[in-house]
Amino acid sequence: NYFNAYASVAYTGVKFGKGNNHRLVLAMQAGIINRHVDQSKFKWGEQWNPITGYNSGNAITESFAATSATTLDIGAGALYYDATPDKKANAFGGVSFFHINKPKDPIISNQTVALNTIPLRYTRHGGVSFNLSNKTSIIPHVLHMQQGTARETSLGTYVKYNVNEETDLMIGGYYRFKDAIAPFVGVDWRNL
């Protein structure tokens, strides 16, 4: 079993520039990761007999250092955005880091340090909101994520239409390099 629980907090009060229309959001996240392994559910190679097949009564030499573990996990991030009204283009961008403390996994502690540690994951994203009218924007953006040797980059764009003061409709798509195309449809309801 794998269970995560996190609490996040963000500070949105950093405003600067002309009319205080440039904004910086700072965020932190802390939580726990809990893992539990039921060793009785595993089937090991030593339990297979080429003639009679699987026999759960066969002795095994495999064991875990621990079958249950809970560890602290910490993350943080920052986002900049230009909130200048009536501007033709407003830029935004951010970065976030997960597993900053590189939590250890005691269940596999007899392995090498690289296998025993959850690697740092970081995310970078940015884009520009091109305001075509007071109701319609087109928003191209890029997202890059990396954890250990795994990397993923997506490029996308969507159109946002302001229905009223409370609601925006969005439609667009993303291309994840060397992998997939993902359509996107969304609704943003404010003041719920």
Predicted regions, residues:
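Outer-membrane beta-barrel translocator/channel fold
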Residues: 1-70, 169-192
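Outer membrane beta-barrel transmembrane domains
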Residues: 116-192
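Short, well-ordered amphipathic alpha-helices
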Residues: 6-14, 76-80, 123-128, 155-160
